[in-house]
Amino acid sequence: MLLICTVIFVALLFTYTNGFHDTANSIATVVGTKVLTPRQAILLAAATNLAGAFFGAAVAKTITSGLVDSNYISSGVLVCALSGSIGWNLLTWYYGLPSSSSHALVGGLCGAALASAHGNWAAIKWIELKTKTVQVLDPATHEMVANKITEKSGILYKVVIPMVSSPVVGFVGGFLFMLLLYMLLRRWKPVTVNRVFGKAQLLSSGYMGFSHGMSDATKCMGIITLALVAGTKAGMFDHFPSWLSFFSVPESADPKNQIIPKWVTALCALTMAAGTAAGGWRIIKTLSHKMVKLQPVHGFAAETTGATVLAIAASYGMPVSTTHVITTSIMGVGCAKRLSALKMDVVKRILWAWVLTLPATAGVGYLLVRGCQAFQWLP
């Protein structure tokens, strides 16, 4: 039970660091355009992150049963996975690098699971294809007929492909949306554009915060639920009194049907909001000031694009990176303005942080578990 409580504590600590680390992603543009002060923007982000965390548990379900084999997961393994992720978050936060908390979590989880399985690569669910039969309406006969569909999941479809495609979609979407706005607003006076989009950016910033909560807070829910599932399978809660039965969570064969306890949802939502309120000025400065000079219309375009990509990915249970999406959206908007508006030295630092996140956190998670095994703290 002590280990379960430790996992919950460390998972909430990860969520808290994710909150202040990723606060920058949801408010950088509204601060960079000077529509809100950092303090006002952080309070807005905290409120919208809290609201978003209560909507959509698809990402949590993917983390719980869609990435690694739960037979190789224990509370100790999860502590190692989370420790590596938290360390990476703090390191990149200290140096002001907008790396991915999502990929840090996935990397740490995969590395720890691999070590727990003593190098058995089957511990990681690389590709999963499930065929299911659904009833659809035949337009010719107007009758319901059986139709087979294939659902794709696993690391490749839920992490790797979205990891590559979401930044591209963010960049292209930001670029095209900004070009469209330029065409529509070409006869407007700059003063009018700034006034209108200064107000509109309050909505887009709130939308971004909501999408961030919907995507990132649910990852913590997945980790805690995974620990509870592992404890339930091990019979850890069999002798608990009835008033503690909420700790027992059975595993579902289908990740889409995995139960996420409501108390876990509430706990993670509040922790994410608290971490968001703590803020992350170092990364805000990188995104809002160093990459490209932003006006309210640019901030609106970047936030709307990024939030939409995040919301769609979250609805499909894909733990994509908020950082990747909003950063590339800002880059796309900057390139629509003029290519020279983009500062490539900053972009290179960000790219290096992206490339290193998955292997670095996977390596740390792996080594931590192997170290615990060497001291016989883990089987």
Predicted segments, located by residue:
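Multi-pass alpha-helical transmembrane bundle typical of ion/small-solute transporters
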Residues: 1-379
